[in-house]
Amino acid sequence: MAAHATSEPAVNLPATQFESQVTEPFGVTLLVRHLPDGIPHDIVSRLFSQYGASAVRPCSGGKLRNAAFVDFKNEAFASQAHRQLNGLRFLGKVLQVQRANKPNDNKKSRQIEESVTKGNAFSTVSTNNDSKSGQILSGEPIAPKLGIDYPFPPHLQYAYPPPDANILANITNALIAVPPLYTQVLHLMNKMNLPPPFRLALPTPPLPKAGPQQTDLEHQSSSESEMESDEDIGTSKSGRKRARHGFLVGLGMDKDVPHETVGVKPSSLTPKEIPRIRKNKHVMQIKITSKVTQDEYKEESENEDPADEPKEKDSNLKPFASLEELEKGRLPPQDILSLPMFKNYTAGNPSVVLYIKNLAKDVVIDDFYYIFGSQFESSEVAKSSLGVRLMQEGRMRGQAFLTFPSVEVAHRALNLVNGFVFKGKPMIIQFGRTPGAAKPNE
């Protein structure tokens, strides 16, 4: 009978026939399958010791590869461990637990287990069965001193709400206040193969919209005027479609592809309306005046001061654009990042020369004095201090070099005018590489 048991292949034995080598001290043995590949024995032992295991015997080959026999002292520990470990996800694997022994003949069970041990090269690893594991399994309270007298639920799962502006703002504040949390977030981004955040700010993906928010948007769109209804309805529909497909950049995205090419719609973290580029709408006003007789017209013409006419003309002709006009004419930062012409934009090293491109075809030299004149005391000082070199032919057409009297003035002008829409095209301004690239205009 013993020779027949040792010659029988170990893989053909059902799992329910395995019993512990020493039934009296161990009591109950469980067979745990689907362990992670290549996991060390000490990690397996520490894992099962938390559930009250007294000994762990991993298997190394055959049908019981990635499996282990776990011994328990009594039926209570084994039943609780079977209930908690079965279906547990451990390092990407779902554990499968079943009983490995039943009250059969001890002699037969020992012969079967010895044959399996020889065929699969079992290695027995004993663990320390201290009092802590028994206390945890028996339901130790979480914090009795604080009034929490119930044990920690083993099957607790969390259901987090979707992100919104307040949640993201609180997370940002926590990252600033707790430096270890910031380091752990960077570690997690590295493990998930996300693009590194050490660069300029990228467009923010749209936040998921809830049901009440969509109804509010529909109510707002219905209350708008008839002249803007077509455009607003088109933008709202496109916004909903993009929000439906707009996901955060994750594992499925190539790391070499920049975010700008993905087509993520820029949005703001603060709960406000979607920013739109303001369009100047020209409204034609027709004034209808009553007919005036010749005598009345003469009296009015005599009362008018002839010196008022040149004053009105002078008030309409401004020597240079004001700071408010430049600020209103600039594109918002989120719109600048979304334009392909600003892809990989860098300001460069500060110098007295500004390199400007993406200019309209009908731009002339006087336009630069009008745009940058606010940096000088008067238009005469601007024409004498600002050197302009406008390229109007060849491959450099639509580009210009401006020479300022100092680096501070050039830096202030770049921050003020970069992205300013002039004659239908946004200006792209960078620092020039060589100070001698631009010469004063004679």
UniProtKB/Swiss-Prot annotation:
Biased composition (Acidic residues): 297-307
Gene inactivation effect: Lethal when homozygous.
Positions with biased composition (Pro residues): 200-209
InterPro entries per the UniProt record, alphabetical: Nucleotide-bd_a/b_plait_sf, RBD_domain_sf, RBM40_RRM1, RBM41/RNPC3, RRM_dom
Domain RRM as annotated: residue spans: 28-102, 352-434
Region Disordered, residue ranges: 101-138, 200-242, 290-317
Record field: compositional bias (Basic and acidic residues): 102-116
Cellular component terms per the entry's GO annotation: nucleus; U12-type spliceosomal complex
Tissue: Ubiquitous.
Keyword RNA-binding: yes
Molecular-function GO terms, alphabetical: pre-mRNA intronic binding; U12 snRNA binding
Gene Ontology biological process terms from the UniProt entry: inflorescence development; mRNA splicing, via spliceosome
Subcellular location field: Nucleus
Keywords noted in UniProt: mRNA processing, mRNA splicing, Nucleus, Repeat, Ribonucleoprotein, RNA-binding, Spliceosome
Biased composition regions of type Polar residues, renumbered to the chain: 117-136
SUPFAM superfamilies, per database record: RNA-binding domain, RBD (SSF54928)
Disulfide bond annotation, renumbered to this chain: none
Physiological role: Component of minor spliceosome required for U12-type intron splicing and alternative splicing of many introns. Binds specifically to U12 snRNA, which is necessary for branch-point site recognition. Required for normal plant development.
Record text on subunit structure and interactions: Component of the U11/U12 snRNPs that are part of the U12-type spliceosome. Forms a complex with U12 snRNA.
Identification of the protein by name: U11/U12 small nuclear ribonucleoprotein 65 kDa protein
Organism this protein belongs to: Arabidopsis thaliana
Gene name of the encoded protein: SNRNP65
